[in-house]
């Protein structure tokens, strides 16, 4: 795992949590939950790739991993759209910076998951 990506996840989640406390927006809750879920999925895929011996057990244990992978890409696309929308409508510089970092992180993680998944195929 890239330590920068892990710290980026933690930073984004912390920033979004602060934003959530300052606003009554319920949709930030969903975004935070999705980010946490995405982080866990990315980490588990990365671990499976690092232990290539687990590749076959991963595939045998969970025949639906390709379907799950597709769902994660859908979640990433949804998050990217949500973050872009938030970025367009916000005027607060703290929020703009947070959403710009979140967008960059999502694009980076999408690429990492693609790389992991190609290694698992």
Swiss-Prot record:
Its biological purpose: Mediates the nuclear export of encapsidated genomic RNAs (ribonucleoproteins, RNPs). Acts as an adapter between viral RNPs complexes and the nuclear export machinery of the cell. Possesses no intrinsic RNA-binding activity, but includes a C-terminal M1-binding domain. This domain is believed to allow recognition of RNPs bound to the protein M1.
InterPro entries tied to this protein: Flu_NS2 (IPR000968)
Primary localization class, coarse: virion
Residues spanned by motif Nuclear export signal: 12-21, 85-94
Keywords (A to Z) from UniProt: Host nucleus, Host-virus interaction, Transport, Virion
Organism listed in the record: Influenza A virus (strain A/Puerto Rico/8/1934 H1N1)
Domain of life the protein comes from: Viruses
Family to which the UniProt record says this protein belongs: Belongs to the influenza viruses NEP family.
Quaternary organization: Interacts with protein M1. May interact with host nucleoporin RAB/HRB and exportin XPO1/CRM1.
Subcellular location: Virion; Host nucleus
Note: Average number present in a viral particle is estimated to be 130-200 molecules.
Protein name per UniProt: Nuclear export protein
Transmembrane in keyword set: no
Gene: NS
């Amino acid at each position: 795992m890239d330590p920068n990506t892990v710290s980026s996840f933690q930073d984004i989640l912390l920033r979004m949590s602060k934003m959530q406390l300052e606003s009554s927006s319920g949709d930030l809750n969903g975004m935070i939950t999705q980010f946490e879920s995405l982080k866990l999925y990315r980490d588990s895929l990365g671990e499976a790739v690092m232990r290539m011996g687990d590749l076959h057990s991963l595939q045998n244990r969970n025949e639906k991993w390709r379907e799950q992978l597709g769902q994660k890409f859908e979640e990433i696309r949804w998050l990217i759209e949500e973050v872009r929308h938030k970025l367009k409508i916000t005027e607060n510089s703290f929020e703009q910076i947070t959403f710009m970092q979140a967008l960059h992180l999502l694009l980076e993680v999408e690429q990492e998951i693609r790389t992991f998944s190609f290694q698992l195929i």
